[in-house]
């Protein structure tokens, strides 16, 4: 990517610049001053968050800023700069896989050792990380393995001295090469590490050995895995800054490439080790670093489990019941359907002007009219339109092709003279009837016409409404057949009583004698 005028003017200033990775789908690089990326280095909350996981989500960053009064853009820039300095470049799959491991071991700060490389210059260890086997290299990129130990002995931490950058002419031809993510090997590792440790921009890092850090600082010789994530907008720029071809170790370096030699802590020079192919990733930390003292998990990091599987809420859940009711399609009136059907009998494929005229006449929204025509054509094609067969003119094709809609122009002229349908009357209102009933409890004949106008009901409907309010009379059921049977049954009983009375009288007479 060729430097523009703004970047050239920024490079001419005394402050160091950092070219951060792309942060959007358009792969726009971010140029920022090195002071802005290091002004938050002393914030313990950010250090602890980066030690826990170097790829926090936007929700985690927002929660950090809300709790500790920080600016979100500065915090995002700080995290990008830390990953750039530490040589961290993961794909989205690697981020999710490592995030799951970190959440599982959330009582440890697994990335604490990376922070020591960020703010301090280190001397080269006695034993370098082993080379990845070829079969692992062929598999491509993979996240940092947290289970494979690596010997990191002889590590001495010293405070990093502020660096001075000398301005040299830039080789624009080298820098104008296109951005190629994950397609070339990293040809010069010392150049990459100077960029990581000192925070130089791409143009400053490519200006020669004079633009690197002071002689007392050593470059940590990593092999960086560069890959463009599919989903995460935080893409590393190391491939773009390190893609220049390195010169042979015996020839003097050019003005656009840094020196192929490394300056060690004791002042001696050493040639770089053979270049590792793309996909090589440094192994994990030593067991002593993994056995850190248990730390309390930050509160913001507890949301990592929820952020890994974002919840998806349907759009209808955010709508109120009134909004959902409005979204429902209203039923078309008989007049509207009659107009649509009469037009469909003449032309099955309406034009834009026809839709506009139908929209004015029927008062229906345009999407509903278009949907009705599509559904009606589908039903006609499958022989499910009886009213069309009954009303179709003889000689008219049953299904008209849109390419030969000759009657559309004629129908447009006819429909242009059709007046729009009158507005539908408002619905009846029975509240005046209820108020009248509550006040009088009885309907007067003089008030029938007045109530009919107020409620928009006919006089008969008003009478029926008041009749429904009147109390219903009690129902009396008379069964004549049952009564006659009961009378017939009662007659023999009366005869028996008379006979008994006569017998008693006879007995009385006998006793008297």
From Swiss-Prot:
Molecular function terms, GO-annotated = DNA binding; DNA-binding transcription factor activity, RNA polymerase II-specific
Q: Where is this motif: Nuclear localization signal?
A: 327-332
Bias kind Gly residues: ranges: 205-217
Q: Where is the composition biased (Pro residues)?
A: 419-429
Name its cellular compartments.
Answer: Nucleus
Q: Name one Pfam family in it.
A: Homez
DNA-binding region coordinates: 31-90, 324-384, 418-477
* Protein name in the entry: Homeobox and leucine zipper protein Homez
- Provide the species name: Rattus norvegicus (Rat)
Q: Which gene encodes it?
A: Homez
């Amino acid at each position: 990517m060729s430097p523009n005028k703004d970047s050239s003017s920024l490079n001419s200033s005394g402050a160091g610049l950092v070219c951060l990775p792309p942060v959007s789908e358009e792969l726009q690089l971010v140029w920022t001053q090195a002071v802005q990326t290091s002004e938050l280095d002393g914030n313990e909350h950010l250090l602890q968050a980066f030690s826990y996981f170097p790829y926090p989500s936007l929700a985690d960053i927002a929660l950090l800023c809300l709790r500790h009064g920080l600016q979100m853009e500065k915090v995002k820039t700080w995290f990008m700069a830390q990953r750039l300095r530490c040589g961290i470049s993961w794909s989205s799959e690697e981020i999710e896989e490592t995030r799951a491991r970190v959440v599982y071991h959330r009582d440890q700060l697994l990335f604490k050792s990376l922070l020591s490389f960020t703010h301090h210059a280190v001397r080269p260890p006695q034993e370098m990380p082993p080379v990845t086997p070829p079969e692992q290299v062929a598999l491509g990129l993979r996240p940092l393995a947290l289970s494979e130990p690596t010997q990191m002995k002889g590590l001495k931490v010293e405070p990093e001295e502020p660096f001075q950058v000398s301005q040299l002419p830039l080789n624009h031809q080298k820098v104008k090469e296109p951005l190629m993510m994950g397609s070339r090997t990293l040809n010069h590792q010392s150049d990459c590490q100077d960029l990581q440790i000192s925070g130089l921009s791409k143009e400053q890092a490519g200006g020669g050995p004079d633009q690197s850090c002071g002689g007392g600082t050593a470059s940590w010789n990593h092999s960086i895995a560069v890959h463009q994530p599919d989903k995460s907008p935080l893409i590393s720029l190391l491939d773009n800054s390190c893609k220049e071809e390195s010169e042979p170790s015996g020839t003097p370096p050019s003005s656009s490439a840094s020196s192929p030699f490394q300056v060690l802590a004791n002042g001696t020079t050493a040639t770089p080790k053979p270049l590792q192919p793309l996909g090589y990733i440094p192994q994990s930390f030593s067991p002593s670093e993994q056995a850190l003292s248990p730390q309390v998990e930050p509160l913001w990091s507890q949301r990592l489990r929820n952020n890994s599987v974002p919840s998806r809420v349907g759009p209808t859940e955010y709508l109120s019941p009134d909004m959902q009711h409005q979204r429902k399609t209203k039923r078309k009136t008989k007049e509207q359907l009659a107009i649509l059907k009469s037009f469909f009998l003449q032309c099955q494929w309406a034009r834009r002007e026809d839709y506009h005229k139908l929209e004015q006449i029927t008062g229906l929204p345009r999407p509903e009219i278009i949907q009705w025509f599509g559904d009606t054509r589908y039903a006609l094609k499958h022989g499910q339109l009886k009213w069309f067969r009954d009303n179709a003119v003889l000689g008219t094709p049953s299904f008209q092709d849109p390419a030969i809609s000759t009657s559309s122009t004629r129908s447009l002229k006819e429909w242009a003279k059709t007046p729009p349908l009158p507005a539908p009357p408002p619905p009846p209102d029975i509240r005046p009837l209820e108020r009248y009933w509550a006040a009088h409890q009885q309907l007067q004949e003089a008030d029938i016409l007045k109530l009919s106008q107020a409620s928009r009901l006919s006089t008969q409907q008003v009478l029926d409404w008041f009749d429904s309010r009147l109390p219903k009379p009690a129902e009396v059921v008379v069964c004549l057949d049952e009564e006659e049977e009961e009378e017939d049954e009662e007659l023999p009983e009366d005869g028996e009583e008379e006979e008994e009375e006569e017998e008693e009288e006879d007995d009385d007479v006998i006793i008297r004698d």
